[in-house]
């Protein structure tokens, strides 16, 4: 479909409540909003129309963000902030009528410059006047860097006067307008309140969906914004103040100079770790030079400790921010004015200049990067999963001392950065998608989970057991490869279990691990370590027995943990029971997820073993044949079948409808896991903050750390699946989407639980391994209990309107489940009698 015909189709499809505006073509699209170009019938001006469907704002927090954005934009007017002209609402949609910025966002100037100078007359003229400093990177000319820094500073100064913190400063939210539209000389330009050079494109801050009124002394705790540009205190779930915006300004300034962000990583926590490890040293590529006073400013902004970070007054009065740029306005540039008017009259958005045959892409020889949406609220959505397993680039570099200037930046390694003919200079990957997505909203529950786990780690017992490790609050623990038993050969039981320090307990891990291997058809990738001695030793074979006994008692209505008063004596059994349920649900989700994104045979997996928060394994169980051989290396065998499929071929091997179904099922199961994990932390939190002594057992501490890690992992994988579903939905016919059947997580759990119990009964009748049968019955009971337990509903767990009150189980459904629970519990009792 041509751009023109597409625009006409859009105009017919969108109808605003009033007739003050006409809607033309779509210029940006994201998960929550579609941005159209339009025209105001009052004065004929071009406008941007941000259409947000109410149906996509299912989360209360997202609706609040939109309402906040509208409220803020109505109150603030500034030449370097995208203005809200009008707002219209219908029963199904919000329409924000905003200033139109025909040149897109700052990423077009940085990442698409090479393509645009060949196609866009105004941008070509700008870069002819102010050429880039080097062909080796995408950094901008110093004049452009300082000009846009000053305009950004002007907008931030205005926001500070209103006690506003933006919380999502990044190049994608810095829009560029064509210059010389309402003025033609420097005097008029500055009288209108603009800062910088009058004949250059004008920068304006957009997207106030995450902004908040926050005085200088106030602290916030919600994690939001885009991780690549987030301050470390936000990445680490700490409270933060308005100085978080200054960190983001530092990252933008660095990117304008070097053509890429200062830090990159595969997830939030790895990014935080890289920032912390840098120890306030900022490394730049060896092919990039930043003058000392700009580099000093970057270092002041990119200071890890917010207390030591440059303050707003110091920033606003910095010599670079206050530098006089009037000398660049002395000469008249007729080309800029004529080209600017041509662009305005052409009615073309910047991305339309980039549409061209694929054959020309190779001939261009420029940097190939992801297209970005360029208007406020248009989320970047790429289909980059197939690049997921490319080797990750080390962006830290090797620091080298500079002899020219003591304040000049250390030069970093150029590995993976310098270009050669026919090669791209940087590789995009799914990791970048996760980090660059437009909206990151982590509910307050996430902050609470991590905060509580840190409290336990800080205040809990260090160790009372020989060989146990101290539990630390940081979420970056890695497995040790040392063997605490010295030269003693591990026993058969120890060789069967390779259990990380975050497992609930050895006995419980054994039960749950076998359940995941034998019953869910999925074996978790094990760590590359062969030792199990550096974790706390909690060998208590009674735990699993107690858990199964409790399941039987609950089935006989002789026990209901939630009706008991929480105390020091029963808090651990409470949490153990919930951990068991969370693990079977998590394992079910992992089985589905492994079919969508198989684990690669290397450490470059997104869910890397180097990051415990994202590690898949709480335990790893060897195959019986391998175990009996006594070969410890057999632990490193990954799941056969699906996990051997390369990520590059997974989309082709699974038909799109089936892939989408798998994604939806896996997402629902991860969300259910999150609900159970949050429930256990809510319970623990209540006990912890009512406990004056703030003392807990080592076992409970380990459980809490395990729950925290699983919670964060499930959240990350749910985000990945949400984005993948969005990509799949975009590629499908709307008619097909309407015809898709609804998937109920309750039915998934119910069917799986009955399937497990049937297989266990068959195995028992065949005289199979009774231990396996016991595990299967227990797993089935835990899954069915999840369906019946009202305390594990999302409405009960999340107190902030996170979920709806919709449930797919009526009383007759519950009665049927109770009958199965009773039947399976009786089988389990009979089996235990046989075993004893």
UniProtKB/Swiss-Prot annotation:
SMART domains: S_TKc. Residues 395-404 have a biased composition (Low complexity). Its EC number is 2.7.11.1. GO terms for biological process: autophagosome assembly; autophagy of mitochondrion; piecemeal microautophagy of the nucleus; protein transport; regulation of autophagy; response to starvation; reticulophagy. It is an enzyme of class 2 (transferase). Keywords: ATP-binding, Autophagy, Cytoplasm, Kinase, Membrane, Nucleotide-binding, Protein transport, Transferase, Transport. Disruption phenotype: Still forms preautophagosomal structures (PAS) in proximity to the vacuolar membrane. GO terms for cellular component: autophagosome; cytosol; phagophore assembly site membrane. Residues 571-836 are annotated as: Interaction with ATG13. ATP binds at residues 27-35, 50. Homodimer. Dimerization requires the presence of ATG13. Forms a ternary complex with ATG13 and ATG17. PANTHER family: NON-SPECIFIC SERINE_THREONINE PROTEIN KINASE, SERINE/THREONINE-PROTEIN KINASE UNC-51-RELATED. Serine/threonine protein kinase involved in the cytoplasm to vacuole transport (Cvt) and found to be essential in autophagy, where it is required for the formation of autophagosomes. Involved in the clearance of protein aggregates which cannot be efficiently cleared by the proteasome. Required for selective autophagic degradation of the nucleus (nucleophagy) as well as for mitophagy which contributes to regulate mitochondrial quantity and quality by eliminating the mitochondria to a basal level to fulfill cellular energy requirements and preventing excess ROS production. This is Serine/threonine-protein kinase ATG1. It comes from Kluyveromyces marxianus (strain DMKU3-1042 / BCC 29191 / NBRC 104275) (Yeast). The gene is ATG1.
């Amino acid at each position: 479909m041509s751009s023109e015909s597409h625009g006409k189709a859009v105009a017919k499809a969108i109808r605003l409540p009033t007739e003050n505006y006409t809607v033309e073509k779509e210029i940006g699209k994201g998960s929550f909003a579609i941005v159209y170009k339009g025209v105001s019938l009052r004065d004929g001006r071009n406008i941007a129309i941000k259409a947000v469907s109410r149906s996509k704002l299912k989360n209360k927090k997202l609706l609040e963000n939109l309402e906040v954005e509208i409220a803020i934009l109505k109150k603030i007017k500034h030449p370097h902030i995208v203005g809200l002209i009008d707002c219209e609402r219908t029963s199904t949609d919000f329409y924000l009528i905003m200033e139109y910025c025909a040149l897109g966002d700052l990423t077009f100037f940085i990442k698409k410059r090479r393509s645009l100078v060949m196609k866009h007359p105004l941008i070509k003229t700008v870069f002819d006047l102010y050429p880039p400093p080097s062909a080796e990177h995408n950094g901008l000319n110093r004049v452009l860097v300082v000009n846009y820094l000053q305009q950004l500073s002007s907008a931030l100064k205005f926001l500070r006067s209103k006690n506003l913190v933006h919380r999502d400063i990044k190049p994608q939210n810095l829009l560029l307008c064509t210059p010389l539209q309402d003025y033609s000389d420097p005097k008029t330009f500055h009288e209108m309140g603009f800062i910088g050079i009058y004949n250059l494109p004008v920068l304006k801050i957009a997207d106030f969906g995450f902004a908040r009124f926050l005085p200088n002394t106030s602290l916030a705790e919600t994690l939001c914004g885009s991780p690549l540009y987030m301050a470390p205190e936000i990445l680490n779930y700490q409270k933060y103040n308005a100085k978080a915006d200054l960190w983001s300004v530092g990252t933008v300034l660095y990117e304008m100079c070097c053509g890429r962000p200062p830090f990159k990583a595969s997830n939030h926590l790895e990014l935080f770790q890289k920032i912390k490890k840098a120890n306030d040293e900022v490394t730049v590529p060896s092919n990039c030079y930043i003058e000392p006073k700009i580099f000093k400013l970057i270092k002041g902004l990119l200071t890890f400790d917010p207390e030591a970070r440059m303050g707003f007054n110091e920033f606003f009065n910095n010599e670079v921010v206050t530098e006089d740029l009037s000398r660049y306005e002395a000469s008249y540039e007729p080309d800029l004015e004529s080209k600017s008017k041509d662009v305005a009259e052409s009615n073309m958005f910047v991305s339309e200049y980039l549409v061209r045959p694929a054959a020309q892409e190779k001939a261009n020889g420029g940097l190939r990067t992801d297209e970005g949406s360029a208007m406020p609220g248009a989320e970047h959505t790429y289909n980059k999963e197939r690049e997921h397993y490319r080797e990750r680039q080390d962006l830290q570099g090797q620091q080298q001392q500079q002899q020219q200037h003591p304040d000049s930046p250390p030069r970093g390694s150029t590995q993976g950065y310098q270009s050669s003919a026919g090669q791209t200079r940087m590789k995009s990957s799914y990791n970048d998608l996760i980090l660059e997505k437009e909206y990151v909203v982590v509910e307050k529950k996430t902050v609470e989970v991590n905060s509580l786990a840190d409290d336990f780690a800080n205040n809990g017992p260090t160790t009372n057991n020989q060989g146990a490790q101290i539990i630390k609050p940081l979420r970056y623990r890695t497995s040790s490869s040392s063997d605490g038993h010295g030269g003693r050969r591990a026993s058969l039981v120890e060789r069967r279990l390779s259990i990380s320090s975050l497992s609930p307990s050895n006995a419980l891990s054994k039960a749950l691990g076998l359940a995941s291997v034998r019953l869910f058809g999925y074996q978790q990738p094990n760590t590359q370590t062969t030792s199990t001695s550096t974790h706390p030793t909690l060998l208590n074979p009674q735990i699993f027995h107690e858990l199964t006994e409790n399941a039987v008692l609950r089935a006989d209505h002789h026990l209901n943990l939630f009706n008991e008063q929480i105390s020091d004596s029963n808090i651990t059994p409470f949490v153990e029971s919930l951990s068991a349920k969370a693990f079977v649900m998590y394992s079910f989700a992992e089985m589905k997820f492994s079919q969508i994104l198989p684990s690669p045979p290397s450490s470059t997996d997104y869910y890397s073993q180097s990051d415990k928060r994202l590690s898949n394994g709480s335990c790893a169980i060897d195959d019986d044949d391998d175990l009996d051989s006594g070969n410890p290396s057999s632990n490193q065998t990954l799941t056969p079948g699906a996990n051997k499929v390369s990520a590059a071929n997974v989309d082709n091997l699974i038909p799109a409808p089936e892939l989408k179904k798998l994604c939806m099922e896996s997402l629902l199961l991860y969300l259910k896991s999150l609900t159970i994990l949050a429930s256990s932390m809510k319970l623990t939190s209540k006990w912890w903050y009512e406990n004056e002594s703030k003392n807990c057992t080592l076992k409970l501490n380990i459980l809490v750390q395990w729950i925290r890690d699983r919670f964060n992992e499930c959240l990350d994988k749910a985000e990945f699946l949400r984005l993948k579903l969005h990509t799949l939905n975009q590629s499908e016919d709307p008619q097909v989407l309407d015809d898709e059947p609804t998937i109920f997580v309750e039915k998934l759990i119910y069917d799986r639980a009955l399937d497990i119990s049937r297989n266990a009964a068959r195995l028992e009748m065949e005289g199979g391994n009774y231990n396996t049968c016991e595990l299967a019955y227990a797993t089935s009971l835990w899954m069915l209990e999840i369906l019946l337990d009202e305390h594990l509903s999302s409405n009960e767990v999340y107190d902030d309107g996170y979920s709806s009150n919709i449930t797919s189980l009526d009383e007759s459904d519950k009665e049927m489940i109770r009958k199965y629970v009773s039947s399976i519990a009786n089988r389990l009792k009979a089996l235990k009698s046989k075993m004893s």
